[in-house]
Regions:
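Hydrophobic alpha-helical transmembrane segments
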Residues: 74-80, 96-104, 119-124, 142-148
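N-terminal signal-anchor module of multipass membrane proteins
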Residues: 2-102
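Hydrophobic core segments of alpha-helical transmembrane domains in multi-pass membrane transport
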Residues: 16-31, 70-78, 95-99, 116-117, ...
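Conserved small/polar residues in nucleotide/adenosyl-binding loops
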Residues: 257-264
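Membrane-interface capping segments at transmembrane-helix boundaries
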Residues: 245-254
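Membrane-interface helix-loop-helix junctions at boundaries between adjacent transmembrane segments
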Residues: 143-165, 173-228
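Alpha-helical transmembrane segments of multi-pass membrane proteins, especially transporters
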Residues: 91-95, 108-112, 116, 120, ...
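Membrane-helix interface "capping/anchor" motifs
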Residues: 78-88, 103-109, 121-131, 181-188
Length: 264
């Protein structure tokens, strides 16, 4: 029962996919089906600047569905690019899920990913070299939504502006992320976040120079503490059980070794 099991590449990706699937199922349980799709539409149409809590904007079920589907798509993208699972895979999936609860949605991430793809094509390299930069760089996705709400421009003009901005962001992120690494010499854990912050500062400054003000928001969900405690407890207990099932006695041995090392 407690023997270590060898996982194939496919098994690893399927296991990681269980987390977003779990939240998608929770979403359908927590919100009526008839309310989820209007909730998703509201998430896409609403401005996404901080703080815009999707639990309030579209409902808990719609927020979980949005985050779960985006995370599944991110995992699938990495899988079908024939990449091996590593720390970046897990980190990017978890960040995608977390920030898809406030800011990223099924509409606004794709222009940036298209820019990343065009950058790879321009340099005649495989998309796998830059996919994690793209997934981390979707932290700038709220800019796409914000540009769709500019003034009295026609919808087609706003869409073209948002698409162009997203592609430009995606195209600039890989070289900028490589350069800012030299600035902090590895002392920033969020290298793409640093690069994204620079791009966001420039874009907001440009908007202000054209008289377009970016209003901050404070839409924050409160309550349902026991509900989320229950949902997360089931998830974490399942993850622990999975670790024992697939890792065998080695999980206990490694945990005990780390505990003794900290004590000494």
């Amino acid at each position: 029962m407690f023997h270590k099991r060898i996982l194939t590449r496919r098994d690893k990706f399927l296991l990681l996919s269980l987390i977003p699937v779990y939240f998608i199922v929770c979403g359908f349980i927590l919100q009526p089906f008839s309310e989820i799709w209007p909730g998703i539409a509201t998430l896409i149409k609403e401005p996404d600047f901080l703080i815009t809590d999707y639990f309030v904007v579209g409902g808990v079920g719609a927020a979980f569905l949005n985050a779960g589907v985006l995370t599944l798509l991110s995992i699938a993208l990495i899988y079908f690019l024939d990449m091996e699972m590593d720390g970046h895979t897990i980190t990017s999936a978890c960040l995608m899920f977390g920030f898809s609860l406030f800011g990223k949605n099924l509409f606004n991430i794709w222009a940036i990913m298209l820019g990343i793809w065009l950058y790879a094509k321009y340099h005649k390299t495989h998309m796998s070299h830059y996919v994690y930069v793209g997934l981390y760089g979707t932290s700038l996705s709220p800019i796409i939504t914000q540009l769709m709400h500019i003034g009295d421009l026609p919808v087609a003009a706003r869409f073209f502006l948002a698409l162009t901005a997203g592609i430009t962001i995606g195209f600039l992120l890989p070289p900028l992320a490589a350069q800012v690494h030299h600035a902090h010499q590895g002392y920033s854990l969020y290298n793409v976040g640093f690069a994204g912050g620079i791009i966001a500062t420039v874009i907001v400054s440009l908007l202000k120079s054209f008289g377009i003000t970016v209003e901050s928001r404070l839409i924050w969900y409160t309550g349902s503490d026991f509900l989320f405690f229950t949902i997360l407890s089931i998830l974490f207990l399942g993850m622990a059980a999975g670790a024992f099932y697939f890792g065998g006695r080695g999980v206990v041995a490694v945990s005990y070794t780390h505990l003794r090392a900290h004590e000494t």
